[in-house]
Amino acid sequence: MIWANGANSDRLEFSTSKEVTVAPTFEDMHLKESLLRGIYAYGYESPSAVQSRAIVQICKGRDTIAQAQSGTGKTATFSIGILQVIDTVVRETQALVLSPTRELATQIQSVIMALGDYMNVQCHACIGGTNIGEDIRKLDYGQHVVSGTPGRVADMIRRRHLRTRHIKMLVLDEADELLNRGFREQIYDVYRYLPPATQVVVVSATLPYDVLDMTTKFMTDPVRVLVKRDELTLEGIKQYFIAVEKEEWKFDTLCDLYDTLTITQAVIFCNTRRKVDWLTDKMREANFTVSSMHGEMPQKERDSIMQDFRQGNSRVLISTDVWARGIDVQQVSLVINYDLPTNRENYIHRIGRSGRFGRKGVAINFVTSDDVRILRDIELYYSTQIDEMPMNVADLLS
């Protein structure tokens, strides 16, 4: 039984199943080589909490309920699971993802296409409000994965353009929202057309009774994964940008700031492992003391670098996003984005602080003319303001 304290209660006790193990790296998941390449090219270095627990269960074919909010890496969790189990040689729909909104369905399609970049995967977003003729053309051509909203998907199945006989997996993303928006009948409609052995994966931020009621009808002995998100906030963080005309000038700008950096401890983020190595060498050549870390390093080496940094033995750490997720060093009060993050969720992971500590801090973004759009996008996404850096930035840190 999934719930522990009365079926009609909305306060459901939910915990991770005992058989769920943690895969610390993507290599430990025994994924296809072409998929692994896509994962690294997408910018992932190590799996998030939900990814390290749920991907293996999904790949094993288990019905899975993952309670996870957005920002935890849930979309990539089921996308990687889907890409591992489909056979791209067979040009038929083998996985179906239902989402509550058109935007989410389209976003999922782009994640699947990006992660499956080396697999030659066909994925179509089948959503309301778009040209039906285009849907029919795409579906008749053959799609390995369909990501859509329940109404349009049910319609395409009824019209026999979306063929269901090869479907192995159904994913319900944001299941609580799907039911909130009154999609229950359409979901049941779709489910009726699927082969009896279809694997079902449910992802939901909350698990109200109606979600669990649906899972009992659709799922067989589901494995459960619960991941709580560490709420991150930008509150109390002063955010600035420095306009740098050319990429090559970032280095001099960083050197000018070095004395300011070492007032406390600083982390400098670059987007690639190669850039981290390059910047570390260049800083050392210029006689600056820095340490560096990225996902290619053996875990042992990473641990010892982290320990040095935690103890304050090293004051400036250059890293990729591998450092950003969930590593909390109390005394870091300055973060520099040498490169702006390629995906905006990583911005808060780099500079945000978990509410438990609510520390003050300063973030400085190096912005070339190409980056202005990304910076504006970050401001909009987080409803925050990033100002030009004042001259007295050192005073803000001391």
Swiss-Prot record:
Enzyme class: hydrolase
Domain of life per record: Eukaryota
UniProt function note: ATP-dependent RNA helicase involved in 40S ribosomal subunit biogenesis. Required for the processing and cleavage of 35S pre-rRNA at sites A0, A1, and A2, leading to mature 18S rRNA.
Chain ranges for the short sequence motif DEAD box as given in the UniProt record: 173-176
Gene for this chain: fal1
Protein name: ATP-dependent RNA helicase fal1
Location of the Helicase ATP-binding domain: 55-225
Motif (Q motif): 24-52
GO molecular function, one term: mRNA binding
Native species: Aspergillus fumigatus (strain ATCC MYA-4609 / CBS 101355 / FGSC A1100 / Af293) (Neosartorya fumigata)
